[in-house]
Amino acid sequence: MSPTDTTPLLYSWDDQSRHQDPDWHKLRNYHGAWYRRISRRRFSQFIFAFGLMTLFVLVYSISSNLHTPTQFTGHKVRGRRGAVASEVPVCSDIGVSMLADGGNAVDAAIASTFCIGVVNFFSSGIGGGGFMLIKHPNETAQSLTFREIAPGNVSKHMFDKNPMLAQVGPLSIAIPGELAGLYEAWKSHGLLDWSKLLEPNVKLAREGFPVTRAMERVLKLPEMAHLLKDPIWQPILMPNGKVLRAGDKMFRPAYAKTLEIIANKGIEPFYRGELTNSMVKFIQDNGGIVTVEDFGNYSTVFADALHTSYRGHDVYTCTLPTSGPALIEGLNILDGYPLNTPSLAFPKRLHLEVEAMKWLSAGRTQFGDPDFLPLDHLDVVSKLLSKEFASQIRNNISLSKTYPWEHYNPSYDLPISHGTTHVSTVDSNNLAVSITSTVNLLFGSQLMDPVTGVVFNDQMDDFSIPGASNAFNLSPSPWNFIEPFKRPQSSSAPTILTDINGDFEMALGASGGSRIVTAVLDSIIKRIDMDYDIESMVASARPHHQLLPDILILESGFSKSVATRMKKYGHKVWRLKQHDTPLSQIQAVTRHHSEYYGMSDPRKYGQAAAY
């Protein structure tokens, strides 16, 4: 469709002309296979009868279902010795307490991540996995992968007949990596005793903690009703027959005992000991295929981080299977445009940003676990990260119009990812950490071992499932098919920036599934090109485009006139309403002169802390 076509490109709820647009029907069909369980719940395989507006909004609210106004309000914090940003205020405080007790940014990040797994355990915990980026001053940044791995007894066709089994239940569980990752980071970089990092979290789980507003929102979701009736979950989520509300105390005694064992004995009991036996027995009793050997064979991966330069700033991010390479591709594309000059003033600047999002989304279809990619394909991925390739891409970008999705040449279809939480930390020595962790969908597999209190992930859902092409005639990505001990692709993009002098500038990352990498890209543009302070960078409205579906989503902070102007470039625009679920949630820390600032995204009710 060209910009001169008369078909409306900006729709509202009452605009019935959208039903005449074939792309809207493609959108519905495209997501049908993956959203049988909307917002981390069981969902009928044939639920296309839902109204398109309802389906579309639900599709883009999978990671959190947290409804907040887009006129987001929050406040940055400031300190002289470091800062921590997380989605839970008490977890940011725990991180800062580690700094105050002589710990460093790695200690703070570990303690805060443990805390989120206690408090907001619908999105994170030691039953999940993730990625960490660590940057010491004057040293090469390190990427730590502790993504979950598929069990040994899997096959790539195991979910062909029923993809729902990859989203909920025992077969959806991959081998957790979070605990191994946190322990490896501590061994390599931590200063405090291991037990010190767990002590406040054991206390929270045992003595109780206030239910967050985010947790209250989750528990009110209709799809959570079955968990509230489950005899394992009910004592935690609905004690005394009443669903807990924000501010009420929640207790997790079994999880407290598990964390206490880990504090005293390290990770051995979890991967090769008493905790392993309990977890494996529970999973197998429920029909799972995870074995004790699977846990014992788990290992993390340390590697040099990926790097690019943007306007003279060094940008570091995590390696495959994250979406860090896609972030680098997007930044390399935009680095060739003077976005802060009058010639590329708004909305042309926004148009170019969206074009970069579409190209990086096409690039993501080439990604997978690097340990399972052939060498010649790794060369293909490396090409995507080069400045030369970005220059070629710019030759295929128009300053006056967008193109149909085929122009961007995606190779394969990818599953839509979900969930996550993020923590960013920095200390007085300018050691910075950016860590993203997840159990995937809400409460992961929705299975919790009553003995250990561990909530297991459903990360098998992040693999691609062989089968028919999607509504856009793209086949599932073979690079992301299930194989024993393989890690699925991830949308995570932990990121650290240094300034033109090589000094720490910012650590950031996001939660929000497939919207993570576009949120990080947008934040970097606002920080470097538009000179936003950290508060404005995090709280301002964000755009999102992931190429397929071919829809530009704008948070409601963008005016309707902006959406209309983007329409003139040929973009199909969906402008969210004020109380629609936000696209993503950023956690960021920065340094300015001798002071440190932290900002937690108010979209998820977070609060940073500084010291």
Curated annotation (Swiss-Prot):
Induction: Induced upon nitrogen starvation and oxidative stress. The active site is at residue 420. Keywords: Acyltransferase, Glycoprotein, Hydrolase, Membrane, Protease, Signal-anchor, Transferase, Transmembrane, Transmembrane helix, Vacuole. It is a single-pass type II membrane protein. GO terms for cellular component: fungal-type vacuole; plasma membrane; vacuolar membrane. InterPro entries: GGT_lsub_C, GGT_peptidase, GGT_ssub, Ntn_hydrolases_N. Heterodimer composed of the light and heavy chains. The active site is located in the light chain. It catalyses: an N-terminal (5-L-glutamyl)-[peptide] + an alpha-amino acid = 5-L-glutamyl amino acid + an N-terminal L-alpha-aminoacyl-[peptide]; glutathione + H2O = L-cysteinylglycine + L-glutamate; an S-substituted glutathione + H2O = an S-substituted L-cysteinylglycine + L-glutamate. This is Glutathione hydrolase proenzyme 2. Cleaved by autocatalysis into a large and a small subunit.
